[in-house]
């Protein structure tokens, strides 16, 4: 499985309240959540993001409250994956559970800039900054996690395997 897109670049400690502000948690509709994704840190995000685009961030992405709405809003906005130095553990699990690929790779994060074209091979963990012509080895997901992501998340995986 691969993804390719333009990069949106953010710093440290992007918390779930910034990813999807609490004032929008009165809905679980993914498209409505996507319309407000990142708006407190990047007001034009929802109008600029295109299907396949990639978020790259520094340390502790997804910290803060444990809300599944955060990775849902990112995925529904069209973002194909998030690459960061590190993720808050609960965000990491929530992202996998809803089928949003996330990769830790400090070497890539140190080089990739906003607007760069990046390609990610989830099977191998290779992250390529196409703009700069550089590749980095991220941590590939174990096969079972790749299966969950390919199924669109844990619920979809369970529904498909129970039939």
Swiss-Prot record:
One annotated GO molecular function: 3-isopropylmalate dehydratase activity
SUPFAM superfamilies with a match to the protein in the record: LeuD/IlvD-like
Induction record: By nicotinic acid.
Keyword Lyase: yes
Enzyme Commission (EC) number: 4.2.1.85
UniProt KW keywords: Lyase
GO biological process: L-leucine biosynthetic process; nicotinate catabolic process
PANTHER family recorded: 3-ISOPROPYLMALATE DEHYDRATASE SMALL SUBUNIT 1 (PTHR43345:SF2), 3-ISOPROPYLMALATE DEHYDRATASE SMALL SUBUNIT 2-RELATED-RELATED (PTHR43345)
Homology family: Belongs to the LeuD family. LeuD type 2 subfamily.
Name of this protein: 2,3-dimethylmalate dehydratase small subunit
Record lineage: Bacteria, Bacillati, Bacillota, Clostridia, Eubacteriales
Gene from which the chain derives: DmdB
